[in-house]
Amino acid sequence: MPTLHSKILGEGQPLLILHGFLGMSDNWKTLGNKYAEEGLQVHLIDQRNHGKSFHSTEFNYDILANDIKQYIAEHNLQNCIVLGHSMGGKTAMQLACSYPELVNKLLIADIAPKFYPPHHHEIINGLKALDLNTISSRTEASNELAKHISNAGVRQFLLKNLYWVEKGKLGFRFNLDVLADRMEQIGENIDASATYNKPTLFLRGDKSEYISPLDTDVIKTHFPNADIQTITNAGHWLHAENPKEFLEKSLTFIKS
């Protein structure tokens, strides 16, 4: 089986960072460098069907967690701290519950262990409407995408995935067809009986609805040692919207 693509920064205890749906390891480069400066060996990982990692029709959280298990083995990593955002948070939860011996501490950014109804249709439809055979620049792609996605920040996030497949031809790094087809799986919960008893921190954005006060019980059911903290002035992309507070709270947890 092919291995996941990653960028490794710094030296020290391994910190594995898992991006969200339609994201990539590069989304975490700025914070990754900050963690590396604090004496951590940061692994910015592209999950399957994302970034520079391999494409596959097989896609669910058991499989994604298994990919990370294999990555840890291939890199001979011990005592890992795992940080996952959104879809990457679900992967991280499943990994920690299935293979607790591999995960020393767990950090989850703005996602709870529950089912989320598919809600990315607008984004997927907008991306599918782009005819990359006729689009010759990022600006043109952005203008076309704006007809479907009004939020400039979301457009910029998505267009980070554009690259030159060959001279004059743009393509997406993510596997759009499979991800569009697997939207139900993205929202799925981790295994119902899954638990992880080691230190766990959930960080939620105060402007995000992904983790509500009602989710405390379900979080504690799966993660009895979980602490839930709020990042101010931040929505679902809390690490990008308030990186200073995200870094402070996450480092306090990592170093405790």
Predicted features along the sequence, with ranges:
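Alpha/beta-hydrolase fold catalytic core
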Residues: 1-16, 37-40, 77-78, 223-224, ...
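Conserved HGGG/HGGXW glycine-rich cap/lid loop of the alpha/beta-hydrolase fold
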Residues: 7-54
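Active-site loop/oxyanion-hole signature of alpha/beta-hydrolase fold enzymes
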Residues: 37, 41-83, 248
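Gly/Ala-rich beta-loop-alpha elbow adjacent to hydrolase catalytic centers
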Residues: 84, 88, 92
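Flexible "cap/lid" loop of the alpha/beta hydrolase fold
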Residues: 94-97, 104-136
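Conserved alpha/beta-hydrolase catalytic His-Asp/Glu region
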Residues: 133-187
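Conserved serine/cysteine hydrolase catalytic core
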Residues: 167-222, 227-230
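Catalytic active-site module of serine/aspartate enzymes centered on a nucleophile-bearing elbow/loop
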Residues: 226-256
